[in-house]
Amino acid sequence: MKALIFAAGLGTRLKPLTNTMPKALVKVGGKPMLEHVILHLKAQGFCDIIINIHYLGEQIIDFLRANHNFGINICISDERSEVLETGGGILKVADFLEDGEPFLVHNSDILTNIDLRGLYQQHIENEADATLLVGQRDTSRYLIFNHEDTLCGWINKNTGEQKPEGFCYDPAQHEAWAFGGIHVISPTLLHYMRSDGWSGKFSIIPFYLSVCQKARIMGSPIDPDRYWFDIGKIETLEEADHFLKNYEL
């Protein structure tokens, strides 16, 4: 199984830690974020991985080389000249990912022990075009799903803005979830990107919202028996670090 790890972020919310290193190499529980993600993917059967790099990307290349790619096939998608954001980053590596099978996308600043293989199998069984890991957490922006767990919109609860055009959030008919930074994508989504004219630098969430009325984009809630942390900011990094020091494997 194939996976893409997003490691091109600037890590502005982790300064001063990221003044001299890329976000993906900031340590949590004594190991770089990226190492946690790679080892989790490897343990779950994802042994063909591509990692995008941008800010201080040469440090990530050196880190992987020093660890012999952790014994699996790891390639680099070099975005050092221009970061392409999440959607553009996926499209850039389409040739690597597009072999007729779904692939998993994992943000490097998500620390979790969820069942990635199970998420992948659920995606296949549901015949989805994309399956997004989602959870309940405080944020202003939510993805909106119907009671069949199919994406149908987005809302900013602070401003009331809703997407796509014509969508109207109804709490009785919809559930609001926050995106969990991990998703499984089928090659059909890449076809939608190309046919709808998406190219260059773009975020994946606006793309999902643009195709949610014709593509099958599903949500999969985080298992409450598993841990999940967004460690992209200082306070949550410290929380995750404390958790790992006390976590019994």
Feature map (PLM): residue ranges:
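Active-site metal-binding loops of divalent metal-dependent hydrolases
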Residues: 10, 108-110
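A short, conserved acidic/glycine-rich loop-to-beta-strand motif
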Residues: 126-136, 141
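Catalytic-core segments of class I nucleotidyltransferases/pyrophosphorylases
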Residues: 102-104, 111, 117-124, 137-138, ...
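A generic "binding-loop/recognition-motif" signal
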Residues: 10, 21, 56, 80, ...
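Glycine-rich N-terminal loop/short-helix segment of MobA-like nucleotidyltransferase
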Residues: 2-28, 42-44, 222
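Conserved N-terminal catalytic core of the sugar/cofactor nucleotidyltransferase
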Residues: 2-5, 31-107, 118, 192, ...
